[in-house]
Amino acid sequence: METSLKRAAAPAGAVAERTVLRNGGAVRDALAVEEPLEIRVDGERLATTMRTPGADGDLALGFLFAEGIIAGVEDVGTVIHCGRPGEEGYGNVMDVRSAAGMRIDPERVLEGRRFIPVSAACGVCGRLSIDHLMERLRPLPAGEPVPTALVAAGMETLARSQPVFERTGGLHAAVLVGRDGAPVASAEDVGRHNAVDKVVGAALRAGRVGPRAAAASAPALLAVSGRAGFEIVQKAAAAGVPVVASVSAPSSLAVDLARAAGVTLCGFVRGERMNVYANGERLGLTGP
């Protein structure tokens, strides 16, 4: 099984330095950059997220795809930063333009959605959120089995795909891995959900995700740092990724969604040792 052993390089603009006190003295410390990114569709503002600069176009594409606003890259003509280099705020606004003969219509897609705050004390709201998502996400088919060795290889690739974290200790990471263990895309960000949007967007551009993607080239695994929450499983299900693995625990709502969406959910992955919270049969296991 092929794995990526080469460490990734940090993207430009992802690290800043500040003077801090350490052991009674002043030193320069590397920090992860956090800045707002406004996502527009055909010039109209849709959303703003706090992110680490880098792969902004992929972030925008992945976000729109996960929300069902675009069906694939065929809907998109251009993805560009607004403004001019040197202007205040340049690089923090991304405009996604419809392809010729197409019209991306967020209002039509989002109309009638139940935007219900979900919290640990709101089990009913959580259930409604899952039911609503499953109205537009079909459960993933069982498909080909995925060996636990692939999960272990994916987590190894994840560990080697965090150059900014190595310098700052302040970022999350995500990586998509194919069935052969080779990385499809990797990204870091201050927001775990942003990192996932970035790798999904990159896979969309590469033709590895989306309605026209060949099953043989589609990613088999999404590996993430930290915990696997509801949003992470949602994005994996939307992208058709059958296995999600994290170094930490999932949330209860993430487990519920994974079981409904046919996503295999693994947590506390240490080599080939892990907890499997949903659809373990895909890994050749019996249980949840």
Curated annotation (Swiss-Prot):
GO terms for biological process: Mo-molybdopterin cofactor biosynthetic process. Its main location: cytoplasm. It comes from the Bacteria. Mo-bis(molybdopterin guanine dinucleotide) binds at F268, V269, R270, G271, E272, R273. GO terms for cellular component: cytoplasm. Keywords: Cytoplasm, Molybdenum cofactor biosynthesis. InterPro entries: Cytidine_deaminase-like, FdhD. It is found in: Cytoplasm. Transmembrane segments: none annotated. The keyword rRNA-binding does not apply. One of its GO terms (molecular function) is sulfur carrier activity. The active site is at C122 (cysteine persulfide intermediate). Gene3D superfamilies: 3.10.20.10, Cytidine Deaminase, domain 2 (3.40.140.10). Required for formate dehydrogenase (FDH) activity. Acts as a sulfur carrier protein that transfers sulfur from IscS to the molybdenum cofactor prior to its insertion into FDH. NCBIfam families: fdhD_narQ. Belongs to the FdhD family. This is Sulfur carrier protein FdhD. It comes from Anaeromyxobacter dehalogenans (strain 2CP-C).
